[in-house]
Swiss-Prot record:
The record marks R57, R132 as: Interaction with phosphoserine on interacting protein. GO terms for cellular component: cytoplasm. Belongs to the 14-3-3 family. This is 14-3-3 protein gamma-2. It comes from Oncorhynchus mykiss (Rainbow trout). The keyword Protein biosynthesis does not apply. Homodimer, and heterodimer with other family members. Induction: Repressed under stress conditions such as netting.
Amino acid sequence: MVDREQLVQKARLAEQAERYDDMAAAMKSVTELNEALSNEERNLLSVAYKNVVGARRSSWRVISSIEQKTSADGNEKKIEMVRAYREKIEKELEAVCQDVLNLLDNYLIKNCNETQHESKVFYLKMKGDYYRYLAEVATGEKRATVIESSEKAYNEAHEISKEHMQPTHPIRLGLALNYSVFYYEIQNAPEQACHLAKTAFDDAIAELDTLNEDSYQDSTLIMQLLRDNLTLWTSDQQDDEGGEGNKD
């Protein structure tokens, strides 16, 4: 029998050593024991996979950029090598995302009861995130399918969070942040992105007195990120409009 506490201890140790693949493997084993995760365990799982997938997302962006430059040069051999390497990274990224999505569907979301709103929103947000990461590298019909799955998960989480969580709750705010990024970057829908981010920010500002002391730092940091994105996105839109003359 695997000792759950030992696995969690190993994940904590791996985090300190910045060995995120080990950390993810340990938390995957904890999840597969099929018992509800504590808040700390939930966060360990999230941090582990965020770093594992984050390394691949970053590599993919670098190689994609090199691929575009190489295509312009017209060196066939080099183009082929870069393309093959991008596809290798893509496969790794897809495997990590699939791993997380399987854990979410087979254990984590499945085991949330009707009153565990915070956990349900946390896991549905995670589901939206990992389908969004798949959408970043997917094309054609596959891209359309993962976008649909991402939006469905984000939307379900959003509805639950509005009904059952304070506007200042860091998980509700984090969801609004990522959902709005999904609209802006994946759906290419800046107006929806801005509306979602602005509503979340304004609702939180209106209820600042409900800010929990424990999560004060987390909540205010996410509010700052929402505001930063809004500033960036609205200036982008103004630039676009300015460049197009007086179009409605």
